[in-house]
Amino acid sequence: MSRLARLREQLSTRDHFCDGWLLVATLSLMLIGWVMVTSASTEVATSLTGNPWYFSVRHGVFVLCSMVVALLVLRIPMAWWKANGPLLLLVGLALLALVLVAGREVNGSRRWLSVPGIPLNLQASEIAKLCLIVYLAGYLERFLPQVRRHWGAFLRPLMVMAVMGVLLIFEPDYGAVVVMTGCVMGMLLMAGAPWGRFLLLMGLVAALGAALAIAEPYRMARLTSFVDPWADQFASGYQLTQALIAFGRGEWFGTGLGNSVQKLFYLPEAHTDFVFAVLAEELGMIGAVAVIGLFALLVWRAMAVGRRAELAKRPFAAYLCYGIALVIGAQAFINIAVSTGMLPTKGLTLPLLSYGGSSLVISAVMVGMLLRVDIETRQARRREQPAAPRTGEARS
């Protein structure tokens, strides 16, 4: 056996209870997120509340609650999610409609629902993402041949996404629209839908996006500031230029944990949407690449869990894993791309890292579902394998 083969055997989690690398990536990102939220929020917390650890303590509570919720989700069989997919979709749509009526407005967007007695604002779009994935996974299991052959079955989930998209645009939450649309199209593509349909739909989506951008002056301002943020660095390009300064200050190894200058009221949303810029400033390019590597590991293992489920003839579980991997991967990519100036500002959190209870809890729920799929698949595989004969029986 070669060295590479031995190393792969040592790193393999094939005979373990669950995918250990998925757990390592998730827990590492949550821990790094807590540390970075603490570092990035001390000055803002002092200014707003007089307590420098206000956001750190709250985020720590969110982390603990997320772990508890993930453990509870781990006990729910996939059969329950499969049976309740349509109901969960209705819950997601109801929350998106409710937030337009009774939602709390922050920075011009009505995205949050206040829950009496709980110091947590629920972000409706985060719950809707999960509900949509569960519904679509069940839909693909039931109508997979029709999705591959007929336009009607192919367009049905896209029509559901269109309804959600309209509700999200009214909030507005364009970042969630992009992530959820990409997730739906990605799941349909992985289910074997023809490429030609995607090319046509991508053209239509691009045309619609251009029309929406032109319709509102502030959207055009975001696009132009993204192309050249330095042209208006104290107005429309301010947030992006400050993020780029943070990346530049970090260089290779960073300024050191807690030594960020940009978090001192220069970079808005330093502990939420732009926490990755503060991370790059304090931990440098090495730290930033390491975090990107952890996200890549998480998405890879989620896809691997889905592939094992697909090979075990468990299509619902497989498509659920693919959808979760697409959502986490797309949201992480967009957030990092926005921070580095590759994409216009979207207002998306960085999963498992950014401050925010709803995002963290839903991300933990998704990981709990991945682990549940993995455990069920491994148990099914062990049941199918013939039991090894006992020593006495082997001799006889």
Swiss-Prot record:
What is the first-listed, main subcellular location in coarse terms? membrane
Q: Where in the cell is it found?
A: Cell inner membrane
A Gene Ontology biological process in which this protein takes part is: regulation of cell shape
- Top-level taxon of origin: Bacteria
Task: One GO cellular component term, please give it.
Answer: cell division site
Role description: Peptidoglycan polymerase that is essential for cell division.
Cited HAMAP family: PGT_FtsW_proteobact
Please give the name of this protein: Probable peptidoglycan glycosyltransferase FtsW
- Gene behind this chain? ftsW
